[in-house]
Amino acid sequence: MKARAQELKASARRGSRADKAAQEEAAVVEKIAEMQESDRAMAERIHAVIKENVPELAPKLWYGMPSYAKDGKVVCFFQSAQKFGARYATFGFSDKANLDDGAMWPASYALTELTSEAEAMIAALVRNAVS
């Protein structure tokens, strides 16, 4: 919660929309660089996949983790295994994502490594989430 409060304060101090977007992306890249190697490698690839496939999503920190927002609302996010003491990292979606599929659907995915198949699945899911 402290991380989120700091994010909100920093966001309020930023200047123009372009300056804010550049600063938020820089904060995401910096946070990714601080991660342990396995999480960092996955987070870097996810960041690249989202920027390549869904460029309308804006990177920003959300509770201290990389996330991607549309119109200021977080659609998807990455959680490092290290930060949460988990055995795997997580790529997940907020309730703003358009993933509804019947009465039940997955909202997060465990990641132990990022294969080309997983990258393709993430790209497809994120494209669908913002459609």
Where are these regions (language model features)?
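Charge-dense, helix-prone N-terminal extensions
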Residues: 2-131
